Amino acid sequence: MAQVNDKGLASGGKLEIVKPVGKRRITHAIHDIDGTHSLIRDWPPVMSISIHHAMTGGLADDFDSDAQAQRLIAASGRQPLPETDRFCVESAGLSALTQMEFGIRRAIQLGNLPKSANLPLTPRVLADNARVIERMWQGEERFEDIPEPAAIRAFIQERTPRLFRLYEKVLNGACRDRNTADARKNPAKWRVPGSLEFMQYLHGLGVKNYFVTGAVIYPEGGMYEEVLAVEFAIGPGKMVEALEGSSWDRKMPKDEVMRELFTRLQVDPSHALVIGDGRTEMKAGTDMGCVTMSRLPHDAKRQREMHVGFGVNYIVEDYVDPVLRKLIQA
């Protein structure tokens, strides 16, 4: 049996104790992947330019063509894009479909639409669209309470998955495929330091580990391939029990995935450890009464400010500090 016990421990080294837990039994752990354990996906510059393309480029019928993908691959990370760069920081942890929807809604707000769209952009519709955008900045993902014309919803529902697929194409070309290939040869290079050993340590204590991601999971390629490349064993009874992911066209916020997983496994959230670097999983973890550990670099000042505001219990830079074995013991 594993337990967290921070009594007698103090912040120092690579561990910051934000909100002490005391002593508590841990049976399950929910882990984010990107930035928390794997470094393969350098997603922020790719997402930034993909969203920027959507909100400024007009969303014409060919906005997601292969030619556009190649153009975005070449331009990814080449210049600062203040609004979308900031949105990627603020929205880390949201489902990719919500992040893509932001780009579509900003295009509507800016009037960057194809003439063929013929949307009913009345002052009321634009005001409601602006409300949704503001709520996205605050980390919300569900907006069914805001009434919108069917034509607006249909346009967003048609364009958003297409933008998601374009983003994945650009991600693959800009970094993901190259980094995954290198990870097969040099897996430690593409893991957060100490990540694999820490996961093995938790598994050895009897903790059941689950990966939860906003990426789409499919049998071959994608996130599943990346996780295997950095040497995490997945399957019942293995280091990681399962990989829970998203869908191309159905929004699946991480907090909802986590709640469904706890219900399915009949897990008391107070005995779960949540480890991540995104706002959604960490706020959900604190809201559900889990033990929460944010994995954030020392210079991630805005993210650290946000996570402290959510009320996380601990912040770590990586998993190398021996104090983690004192914090979590048998």
What is each of the regions a protein language model found here?
Residues I17-P20, R25, I30, P149, ...:
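Short, acidic loop-to-helix structural element flanking the phosphoryl-transfer center
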